[in-house]
Regions:
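Acidic beta-strand-loop-alpha-helix segment within the catalytic core
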Residues: 1-60, 107-131
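Small-residue (primarily alanine) positions within well-ordered alpha-helices
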Residues: 2, 84, 91-93
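Short secondary-structure boundary segments
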Residues: 26, 74-76, 98-100
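Small/polar glycine-rich anion-binding or flexible loop at a beta-alpha turn
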Residues: 56-57, 77-81, 101-106
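Hydrophobic residues within well-ordered alpha-helices
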Residues: 61-64, 85-90
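Alpha-to-beta junction loops
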Residues: 65-70, 92-93
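Acidic, metal-binding active-site segment of PIN/NYN-like and related structure-specific nucleases
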Residues: 92-108, 112
């Protein structure tokens, strides 16, 4: 299980991505950041809103305890995601790459089960528009 201050935590039971508060991160590379911003601009009309806090570990824990509904980012390091992704899964989240495959630092999506597939499809579609 996952705990916060000795209390069991669970991710939100959200099932509608139009109500999802989604968190992401942006690259330090200006070119990559431009592509990421274009992706987010394509997604913003289909979700409630976007947030950025700047630390994958915190973002993942915020999804785990229900402060956020989803988190996605790319080009992370294993140490950026290892603990937070485990906590999120223990809190009931699903995790994978943007297409729903296995977790990998190159692409990470974490969300409650009810929005994982629709959010994965949205991220994939918004990303393919950049190619």
């Amino acid at each position: 299980g996952a705990f916060l201050n000795d209390q069991t935590i669970h991710c939100n039971a959200i099932e509608d991505i139009s109500q999802a508060l989604v968190c992401t991160g942006f690259s330090y590379s200006a070119g990559a950041r431009t592509i990421q911003a274009q992706r987010v601009s394509r997604m913003i009309h289909d979700i409630r809103d976007i947030r950025r806090f700047g630390a994958a570990s915190i973002d993942l824990c915020f999804v785990a305890c229900g402060r956020l509904d989803a988190y996605f980012e790319e080009n992370l390091f294993p140490w950026d995601i290892a603990a937070g992704e485990l906590i999120a899964r223990e809190a009931g989240c699903l995790s994978g790459d943007f297409s729903g495959g296995p977790v990998r630092p190159a692409e990470l999506l974490v969300s409650p089960p009810g929005i994982f597939r629709p959010l994965s499809a949205l991220i994939t579609a918004a990303s393919s528009d950049n190619e």
